[in-house]
Amino acid sequence: MSAEPANGPTEDQVEILEYNFNKVNRHPDPTTLCLIAAEAGLSEEETQKWFKQRLAQWRRSEGLPSECRSVTD
């Protein structure tokens, strides 16, 4: 049996993702996203999906629409 759940990142991977989300950048550019994915041992697609979902969760917690764009878009 695999230690990694089929439906999401492991606790260690989430710790890496959360650190980068909270301390580094909520909107990583493609190069940074690639580096975070490599550090966490996830694909770029999985990492991008996680950041998108986490950003929506953060926006809801701040009372913002979950799908609003940044002011730089």
Swiss-Prot record:
GO terms for biological process: cell differentiation; regulation of transcription by RNA polymerase II. GO terms for cellular component: cytoplasm; nucleus. Keywords: Cytoplasm, Developmental protein, Homeobox, Nucleus, Repressor, Transcription, Transcription regulation. It is found in: Nucleus; Cytoplasm. Residues 3-62 bind DNA. SUPFAM superfamilies: Homeodomain-like. InterPro entries: HD, Homeodomain-like_sf, HOPX. It comes from the Eukaryota. PROSITE patterns: HOMEOBOX_2 (PS50071). Its main location: nucleus. GO terms for molecular function: DNA binding. Gene3D superfamilies: Homeodomain-like. CDD domains: homeodomain (cd00086). Interacts with serum response factor (SRF). Component of a large complex containing histone deacetylases such as HDAC2. Interacts with the acetylated forms of HSPA1A and HSPA1B. Interacts with HSPA8. Atypical homeodomain protein which does not bind DNA and is required to modulate cardiac growth and development. Acts via its interaction with SRF, thereby modulating the expression of SRF-dependent cardiac-specific genes and cardiac development. Prevents SRF-dependent transcription either by inhibiting SRF binding to DNA or by recruiting histone deacetylase (HDAC) proteins that prevent transcription by SRF. Overexpression causes cardiac hypertrophy. Acts as a co-chaperone for HSPA1A and HSPA1B chaperone proteins and assists in chaperone-mediated protein refolding. This is Homeodomain-only protein. It comes from Sus scrofa (Pig). The lineage of its organism: Eukaryota, Metazoa, Chordata, Craniata, Vertebrata. The gene is HOPX.
